[in-house]
Amino acid sequence: MEFIRRFVGLFILYGRFVLLAVGGYVFTMSSYAFSGKERAELFVSGWRFHLGNPEGDASRQDFDDGAWRLLDLPHDWSIEGDFSADHPARKEGGALPGGLGWYRKVFEAPREWQGKKVFVDFDGVYMNSEVFVNGNSLGVRPYGYSSFRYDLTPYLKWGERNVLAVKVDNSTQPNSRWYSGSGIYRNVWLTVVEPVHVGHWGTFVTTPEVTGEKAVMEVRTMVKNDGQAGRRVGVVSTLLDARGRMVAGQSGFVDVPAGGCSEASHTLIMTAPELWSTEHPYLYKVRTELKVDGRSVDTYYTTTGVRHFKFDARTGFWLNGKHMKINGVCMHHDLGCLGAAVNVRAIKRQLEIIEGDGLQRYPLHA
């Protein structure tokens, strides 16, 4: 993972991989932190898939999908088809078929989850998806390049069989000028939290002041309360170095109304910070812990790097006070003959090639 870490912290993170910019421009403040999914588990194995619109209502819990194909996500059904110039996607869309497909997954919701919140997170579905749980529609997501989340809690049957169904419609062609793929082409996650928890992507970490001697880190945390009563919540922010040792910390309280959210802000100060660079890709973690009545109810980790940079119209780009020439490539998100479904090893190989060519800029074009 070392070669991937050399890209992290300077620019924006995309899913679990890195890109430098969107449209050629860098979007960042002094620091941008990627919040991980430590409380979530991958929800990608044991799905059933059917290409086309089946007879009957495939969203229903009691629908018989026994004859459907068994597979693991991520999945791109277009790459499995035959190439033809007659496909509506045309050569610009890869000359591969689109169409409509269904995915279904059976899972159990343990009784110990009762009283908690259960969410399903989709990192990417192409395109125009509708998600159902036990026959209940959770919503429709247009297009296909944004992650999205649904709350499963009101529809789950505790200690019983539950069914998640996803309809994916990529039949309107052409709809892009590149190969898009079709299906649930990114990971799916199941997140289980207490009613009081850090909100979705609920931490934002910046470093407004960075030198070789000192760094000031601002940590903003959105605390969500899905309970029936207001809560006074203790918020503890702890900065950890790469070995897990405490560097700085601050705590406080926020009052969070029932069904609402409140923001906690902390300032962490470190001396002699390890500055992130392509040669020294050092990463810290911010651990955010929430407490209600002295009991820990949620712990959330945010990975971040500490560095400072500037663009100068005359001299170019500077990182940590050193001049740096930015070289890179522009790529679409698909993996060639492997299709659009994310493949970790294939992306590692891309980054290895990029690094081997002396490049450090990796914007995704979509």
Where are the predicted features?
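Accessory carbohydrate-binding/adhesion or oligomerization-edge regions at the termini
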Residues: Y32-A85, A89, V163-K167, S171, ...
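N-terminal carbohydrate-binding accessory modules
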Residues: E38, P54, T203, R287-G356
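Accessory beta-strand-rich segments of carbohydrate-active enzymes
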Residues: R39, F43, H50-P54, G93, ...
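Short strand-edge motifs at loop-to-beta-strand transitions and within beta-strands
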Residues: Y103-K105, S146-Y150, G252, G260-L268
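Short glycine/proline/serine/threonine-rich loop/turn segments at secondary-structure transition edges
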Residues: W113-K117, L156-R161, G230, M270-K285
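Beta-strand-rich binding/interaction modules
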Residues: V133, K214-D255, S262-H266
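Hydrophobic/tyrosine-rich beta-strand signature of extracellular beta-sandwich/beta-rich modules
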Residues: V166, S237, V286-T288
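Short beta-strand edge segments in extracellular beta-sheet folds
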Residues: T191, D255-V256, T303-R307
